Amino acid sequence: MNKVILRILALLFLLGIGAVSAQPDGRIVGGADTTNYHTKYVVQLRRRSSPSSSYAQTCGGCILDAVTIATAAHCVYNREAENFLVVAGDDSRGGMSGVVVRVSKLIPHELYNATIMDNDIALVIVDPPLPLASSSTMEAIEIAAEQPAVGVQATISGWGYTKENGLSSDQLQQVNVPVVDSEKCQEAYYWRPISEGMLCAGLSEGGKDACQGDSGGPLVVANKLAGIVSWGEGCARPNYPGVYANVAYFKDWIASRV
């Protein structure tokens, strides 16, 4: 096979892959129902397409402090803050039993690259602040100080599809997957760079993963935020781990903006 054909194939792969938020709604692949008792740091980002339309859950996020939510840049890039709501303390997608707050500011990473999904991290500033001190259903999560070791179990939470192009569920889901070596991840995604700002996790046999609608949600290791759901090839496919924003890599960036 000559170099021209290889380049064409690589380009087709690149065009075919997208952020996992491309089709919001649904739940984690291969996971199980959970409640916000175990995931008090998880929030829903709900967005309306226009001032006259209704809000719908489009991405996840996690609480860093009373006014700061971490999510994926592709969830908020080129969007208006006034068209978002954050819902905390509610594990039902579309439910209204939690605390609903408006968004005052969106801060996507200034070097976010939508083509290769690099620096796919953003902060969402809410107003009024979340009542963390008086709430039993929401809490902030600590940021991981360093990238987790290969093989360590990580927990993903979200409302994404149960399978590629699958059906949706109203209940928050969780699944555990191991952290994958970055070099092996790069071999899988040979047509797109796996940068220092990315972290990979998943099973070689597939079956467990984040999916459409989980974007912006947390990947947690030892009760600390290690990753943010970013992108992948399909959902839960063998030999294609999920790719996450590597939160430890961005800790200084986060600190400079909160």
Curated annotation (Swiss-Prot):
Q: Name the PROSITE patterns on file.
A: TRYPSIN_DOM, TRYPSIN_SER
Spell out the residues of the site Required for specificity. D209
The UniProt record lists the keyword Transmembrane helix: no
Coiled coil ranges (UniProt) are none
The record ties this protein, via CDD domains, to:
Tryp_SPc (cd00190)
What range(s) does the Peptidase S1 domain occupy? 28-258
**For this UniProt entry, what's an example GO CC term?**
extracellular region
Enzyme class, spelled out: hydrolase
Which residue ranges make up the pro-region? 23-27
Catalytic activity annotation: Preferential cleavage: Arg-|-Xaa, Lys-|-Xaa
Per the similarity annotation, which family is this? Belongs to the peptidase S1 family.
Q: What is this protein called?
A: Trypsin eta
Native organism is Drosophila erecta
